[in-house]
């Protein structure tokens, strides 16, 4: 019997400025899908068969960090797919991984290669848990723990960049000088901060 299940989860209020949503996908049949870029980096936990992306000639790892991409792509799996995905706002992933988001641009990186002990432990907990709703709660606890120490500073920096990104949505042809003014930063400071949070 063919079974497919797709479910979205809303992040807790504290994480909503950083996380767009979580989603879980389960299927016991082969997958052949065409996707469009959404502009958001993701952390992907493959509980079963990972996805193959021919445009990059890469099979995702069980724990994958997927950067922002500027191209559409195909996704293939042989069947028995089960994945949990954390979808970040374009500028937010770096605060959880302590790595500039720009380093993941157009890439699928093994989460294990980041040598992040707490992320690896989270992956183990997720892979050992059958209940995906509980897995989402594990993810949320991990995300909150990652921002607890530097929340005030990071929140201030995120608000500056978020204001600029909101303006880009309204006026796509806006100049960098105007954006830096909105963020109350010099052009050079703005470019550095914007690039560390986003690849847009």
Explain the meaning of each model-derived region.
Residues 176, 193-194:
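Extended amphipathic alpha-helical scaffolding segments in membrane-proximal extra-membrane regions
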Residues 194-200:
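A secondary-structure capping/hinge motif
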């Amino acid at each position: 019997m063919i079974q497919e299940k797709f479910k979205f989860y809303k992040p807790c209020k504290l994480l909503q400025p950083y996380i767009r949503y979580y989603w879980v996908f389960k299927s016991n049949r082969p997958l052949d899908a065409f996707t469009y870029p959404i502009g958001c980096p993701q952390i992907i936990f493959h509980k079963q068969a990972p996805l193959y992306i021919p445009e990059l000639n890469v099979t995702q790892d069980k724990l994958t960090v997927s950067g922002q991409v500027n191209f559409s792509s195909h996704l293939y799996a042989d069947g028995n797919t089960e994945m949990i995905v954390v979808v970040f706002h374009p500028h937010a992933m770096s605060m959880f991984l302590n790595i500039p988001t720009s380093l993941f641009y157009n890439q699928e990186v093994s989460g294990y290669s980041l040598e992040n002990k707490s992320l690896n432990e989270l992956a183990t907990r997720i892979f050992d848990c059958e209940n995906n709703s509980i897995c989402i709660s594990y993810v949320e606890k991990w995300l909150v723990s990652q921002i607890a120490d530097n929340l005030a500073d990071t929140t201030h920096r995120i608000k500056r960049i978020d204001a600029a990104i909101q303006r880009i949505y309204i006026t796509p042809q806006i100049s960098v000088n105007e954006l830096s003014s909105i963020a109350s930063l010099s052009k050079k400071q703005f470019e550095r901060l914007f690039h560390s949070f986003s690849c847009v």
